[in-house]
């Protein structure tokens, strides 16, 4: 069954945005270097396979192999560092990859069909980038909320400790500081 371009692109973007939000376990430096080499070798192999195609099909093939390489590098970087910032970069790389390939596919069309295709592709790209940005902002908001909750809980504990005197108060404050990360 052949789906219209807009439906295909929407499905790709939806699939792309289902990113694991949990922090991944990091990989060793040796695995990271091996991954970089593997990605580079895979890219060279896929790129050379594109020579069998002609005209825009070759351009699409080259763009797909380049897109796969960029996404793989971003995912590898996230696997190595496990930073939320790198997870965001994975989302951006995927959005950019889908956009670049879809834009290249639009070159097969002509006239108004091509213009519509390019506009739809650009709109999908902008939406995907907005979703990545929103995910990043939600993560930051959760972090801020957790910090606010921890600070509020610390103030409550400190207030309870104020009712004590002497060593009991000092021990209580030390325990509260340790518990709520105020060391």
PLM feature spans:
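Bacterial N-terminal signal peptides that target proteins for export
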Residues: 1-11
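Mitochondrial intermembrane space
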Residues: 3-4, 23-183
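N-terminal signal peptide c-region/cleavage motif recognized by signal peptidases
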Residues: 19-21
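Repetitive helical segments and hydrophobic/amphipathic motifs
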Residues: 15-17
């Amino acid at each position: 069954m052949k789906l219209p371009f807009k439906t295909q692109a929407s499905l790709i973007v939806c699939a792309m945005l289902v990113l694991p939000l949990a922090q991944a376990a990091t990989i060793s430096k040796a695995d990271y270097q091996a991954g970089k080499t593997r990605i580079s070798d895979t890219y060279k192999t896929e790129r050379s396979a594109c020579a069998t195609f002609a005209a825009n099909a070759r351009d699409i093939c080259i763009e797909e192999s380049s897109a796969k390489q960029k996404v793989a590098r971003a995912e590898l970087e996230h696997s190595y560092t496990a930073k939320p910032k790198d997870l965001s970069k994975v989302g951006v790389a995927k959005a950019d990859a889908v956009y670049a390939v879809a834009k290249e596919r639009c070159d097969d069309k002509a006239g108004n069909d091509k213009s519509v295709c390019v506009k739809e592709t650009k709109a999908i790209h902008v939406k995907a980038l907005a979703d990545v940005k929103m995910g990043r902002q939600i993560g930051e908001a959760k972090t801020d909320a957790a910090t606010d909750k921890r600070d509020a809980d610390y103030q409550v504990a400190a207030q309870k400790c104020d009712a004590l005197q002497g060593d009991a108060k000092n021990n209580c404050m030390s325990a509260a500081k340790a518990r709520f990360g105020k060391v």
